[in-house]
């Protein structure tokens, strides 16, 4: 079965104070849980600041990856270095999946792991078995990565809620955040929110197209 795997670690994790460590872990788990109505998804931490996520429906892997980064940035405490993660998405077959993610194996794990080994200063990369797909998605992923890395906490929260509750009006989401609609709209536009959502939808449709080939 083709699934998605996200391999990641926290950026500058040694700068995160001990009192915030559990909060960061909770943020990651809470974010992943938000997607359970769409797909089975499981997150497992290892080596303290590293983690892997398995996504049963691979078309949602990018949405989950962006949501993880958005949620981390949105929940960063005041006067702290912005929380973020480096994430490598791998899409492929997973013939063997054990109870523990880190002992599972398959194409998606290998693609994700190898990509993560070469992620360098990037914070989002995607690898699949399809060369044409990788070429089509690489440039727009670099652009999206640059946009996400520049988000403020408020911009990140606005995009995060818009991704999760696409059926809600901006006015309703603004009220949830105790913002005016104008303020919400300002953060949405400055975060390039619509472009990010379009990128996510493009990824979803492209993945499904290649899977069906």
Q: What does each model-identified segment do?
A:
Residues 1-213:
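Regulatory and interdomain segments flanking nucleotide-handling catalytic cores
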